[in-house]
Amino acid sequence: TSERLLIEGTLPGADASELWRVLRPAGGVAVLGGEVKQVELKNWFVRGKVPGVKLEDGKKSWAIVRRGKLKGAGDWTHQYAGPDNTTNSRDDLVRGDMGILWWGEPGPKPMPDRGGRNPAPLAANGRLFMQGNRMFFGMDAYNGTILWSLSAPEIRRSNLPRDGSNMVASDDYLYLSDGRYCIGIDGQTGERKLRFSAPKGRDWSFMAVAGKQLLGSSVLPDSAYKADDEIGEWYDSG
């Protein structure tokens, strides 16, 4: 929103290019309104080369613009990037040296020990999904804001060299395997919205999202590696 436009009725800057530059990709929304002619508001966006602007006229002029995914941006939706396990995000934007985009929560405290070889974080549609020690975080990939956190004492996975991850992501959902069930978590809110059952006497195992399909295999109950906290994190005697 623009305080100057709302209170004074003057547009901020010569055009909307700066607004578009700082607006978060993959879901950022800007809403502007005030005592300004609609044609002036429209031309302000046109000069800034901002696409997809919706205008409404009433006692005040209003404009709303939503920014989509960056063209060429890649995702990391599975343990090894995609359902084909290529370890390639297919991102066409990252070049040269890398730096720190943001720094902060959730930090190391809620994370499990790295020695357990735990599931990798996932990235989809501008969000990051991180698995802590029996808890999960949904985060804004562009500024690090924690969108939601979810305590799940019953969900744990480790020893990934010998097992599959217990989570995959799509543009809209994070899918978690929880014993016999696969839970679909709303990527933006953290709400548990979907539940899929494995056949009786089986647990969910490997999962993948391909297009609009959720695929999975099943295993015997309680056969996944969970790194039990009470008996230690040993997997074999070798």
Where are the language model's segments positioned?
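Blade/loop signatures of beta-propeller domains
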Residues: 74-106
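A short acidic, Gly/Pro-enriched loop at the edge of an enzyme's catalytic core
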Residues: 1-5
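Repeat-blade elements of multi-bladed beta-propeller folds
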Residues: 113-136, 158-183, 199-237
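A short glycine-rich, Lys/Arg-flanked "PGG" loop and its adjoining helix->strand segment in the class I
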Residues: 12-28
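A short beta-strand motif characteristic of beta-propeller blades
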Residues: 102-112, 147-150, 154-157, 191-196
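Short loop/turn segments that connect beta-strands within beta-propeller blades
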Residues: 141-143, 186-190
